[in-house]
């Protein structure tokens, strides 16, 4: 499935992975992951970011996300992750564009 990976001080990029927890954990760099549901996507991140003193990556709805995080599609029927559509990729690539985030946004809303 195609996902977006957003790393600290980097532009978002598309990555193709298997639809399994191990693939997500490997990217996040942590065995424990947190999943937040937002409309048509899921935000996957490291819940220990504050405890591990990871740098703030982006702000989402006022929440400081620390460390690398992932955006996946949301398969509501199956209650599972799914790949992002081309439209979703475009939308979230623009939303988390580093230059946009740095220049004039402190908080992105999903």
Across the structure, where does each feature detected by a protein language model lie?
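N-terminal low-complexity, intrinsically disordered segments
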Residues: 1-19
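Short, surface-exposed beta-strand/loop "edge" segments at domain boundaries and coil↔beta transitions
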Residues: 10-14, 50-54, 77-82
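A short, sequence-level motif marking secondary-structure junctions
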Residues: 17-24, 58-61
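A glycine-biased structural micro-motif
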Residues: 29-30
């Amino acid at each position: 499935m195609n996902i977006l990976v957003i790393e600290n001080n980097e532009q978002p990029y598309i990555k193709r992975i298997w639809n399994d927890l191990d693939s997500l954990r490997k990217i996040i760099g942590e065995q424990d992951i947190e999943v937040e549901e937002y409309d048509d996507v899921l935000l996957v991140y490291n819940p220990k970011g504050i405890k591990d003193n990871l740098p703030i990556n982006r702000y989402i709805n006022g929440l400081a996300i620390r460390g690398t995080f992932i955006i996946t599609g949301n398969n509501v029927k199956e209650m599972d992750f799914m790949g992002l559509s081309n439209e979703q990729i475009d939308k979230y690539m623009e939303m988390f564009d580093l230059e946009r985030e740095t220049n004039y946004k402190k908080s992105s809303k999903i």
